[in-house]
């Protein structure tokens, strides 16, 4: 999108200015917390954690599973499932059009990806929410994918891990969406009865029907640092109760302090700690340890001045 400067500056000057920087576009990303400009290849190497302030940036579902699972032996589950507009829902835009736009922008069919694989050699089933797909909202396909993933875990008696990032139930699917809360809770009860471990990992943000169902039903409830977790958002609560909320209210650190979650794990530790926990839960040999991530942080270069000045 062009800004006011683009409108008043001749295109020739704009192009020459870009050429003088010598920095290709799209190589830098701004940290939403500290405002530092981060070199994308280094940011990816650091698992999308800001090396300046330690802020955990949001990542896509596939990126999340790529970080967490071993490279070999992955199998995507229920990849054929696609959402449909059974209620012919329309608000300011048709639901059918919203789905098409979300599928085009994310490359995913819906807001959940499920895979069977291993992490540090420990077999498991892992799910991850795609927040960029309609806010990671839970509709019929998300609920069905989660249930099928849990059933694979039941069939093979291997643990289930879910990374949540969601605004809640999908309003465009109305009662069909709300039913997924009961549906996912029911299959998790089956896992519990069979003694199959389920670990819930909450990432920024987790709200609504997802936080009120599968996200808070883990045998172990883990969160990333500074993740926003709750049922209604803080602004909605403040407008309702007409009071200022405590500092850090609904952040993972606040929830840990008040006993709502079991632990907070840094993204660098997530894979190793969960693998060790699952190995202990399932009486398997303890996995090894991974080398720490190390690199020198590159500072964003200044705009090169033209020669002769």
Curated annotation (Swiss-Prot):
It is found in: Cytoplasm. GO terms for molecular function: acetyl-CoA carboxylase activity; ATP binding; carboxyl- or carbamoyltransferase activity; zinc ion binding. Residues 27-296 form the CoA carboxyltransferase N-terminal domain. Binds 1 zinc ion per subunit. Disulfide bonds: none annotated. Zn(2+) binds at residues 31, 34, 50, 53. One of its GO terms (biological process) is malonyl-CoA biosynthetic process. Residues 288-309 are annotated as: Disordered. Component of the acetyl coenzyme A carboxylase (ACC) complex. Biotin carboxylase (BC) catalyzes the carboxylation of biotin on its carrier protein (BCCP) and then the CO(2) group is transferred by the transcarboxylase to acetyl-CoA to form malonyl-CoA. Belongs to the AccD/PCCB family. This is Acetyl-coenzyme A carboxylase carboxyl transferase subunit beta.
């Amino acid at each position: 999108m062009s800004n006011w400067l683009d409108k008043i500056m001749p295109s020739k000057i704009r192009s020459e200015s870009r050429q003088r920087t010598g920095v290709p576009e799209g190589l830098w990303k701004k940290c939403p917390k500290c405002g530092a400009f981060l070199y994308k290849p280094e940011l990816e190497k650091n698992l999308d954690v800001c090396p300046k302030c330690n802020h955990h940036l949001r990542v896509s579902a596939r990126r999340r599973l790529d970080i967490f699972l071993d490279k070999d032996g992955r199998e995507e589950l229920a990849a054929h499932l696609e959402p449909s507009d059974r209620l012919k829902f329309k608000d300011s835009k048709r639901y059918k059009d919203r789905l098409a736009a979300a599928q085009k922008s994310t490359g995913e069919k819906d807001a959940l990806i499920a895979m069977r694989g291993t992490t540090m050699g420990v077999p498991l089933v892992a799910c991850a929410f795609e927040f960029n797909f309609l806010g990671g909202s839970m509709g019929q396909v998300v609920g069905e994918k989660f249930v099928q993933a849990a059933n694979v875990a039941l069939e093979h008696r291997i643990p289930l891990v879910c990374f949540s990032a969601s605004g809640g139930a999908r309003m465009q699917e109305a009662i069909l969406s709300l039913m997924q809360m009961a549906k996912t809770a029911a299959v998790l009860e089956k896992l519990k009865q069979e003694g199959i471990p389920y670990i819930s990992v909450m990432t920024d943000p987790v709200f609504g029907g997802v936080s009120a169902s599968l996200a808070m039903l883990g045998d172990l409830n883990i969160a990333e640092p500074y993740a926003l977790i709750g049922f209604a958002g803080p602004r909605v609560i403040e407008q309702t109760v007409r009071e200022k909320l405590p500092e850090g209210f609904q952040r993972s650190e606040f929830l840990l302090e008040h006993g709502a979650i079991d632990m907070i794990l840094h993204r660098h530790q997530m894979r190793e700690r969960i693998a060790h926990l699952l190995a202990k839960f399932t009486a398997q040999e303890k996995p090894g340890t991974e080398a720490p991530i190390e690199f020198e942080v590159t500072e964003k270069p200044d705009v090169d001045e033209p020669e002769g000045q």
